[in-house]
Amino acid sequence: ATGANMAKDWQIKKRRPVRRKNIAPLLKDLESALGIDLAVDGAFLEMADYGPWKMVLVDRVPVAVELMSPDDERVVFLTLRGFLSYPCEKRFVEVDHGAIPFLMKGADCMVAGIHNADEEIKEGDLVWVRDQTHKRPLAIGWATKDGPSLIGELKGKGLKNIHWVGDELWEMEL
């Protein structure tokens, strides 16, 4: 397993408090990639291993993960709970109501269900899926096409789902 996809049997290991300065580079990468301000000053920060992923917890909530892409590059991204706490307009893919039940079962996202997306998305980017109506985060996955193709094409897979509302990471009680 490369760690590009989550596995059901992963456990939280090596959970430890960290100082902000020790994870500042990781937080900066995340802030610049998504155009957000994490504002974690004064928060209780922890790191933990979750399978091959490194997880950042802010006040006991897993808000970010560091993982390897299918191309073996290090990627830092918000979890779905992270997107609830830090709304963002970058790297989003917007789906219609019909796509939601499939995503919630861990299915990959087909382009037919995609109605809007960040045009800056490149093939291979980690992206987040939100619903068209409420703009709530639903899933995270690897884009299999660039932004304009995600919006314009009518057939094929749009992204490989790796984390969705209701999965083990979402349900985690810490």
State where each predicted segment sits.
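Beta-strand/loop-dominated core regions that host nucleotide or nucleotide-derived cofactor-binding catalytic loops
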Residues: 3-53, 57-115, 121-123, 129-174
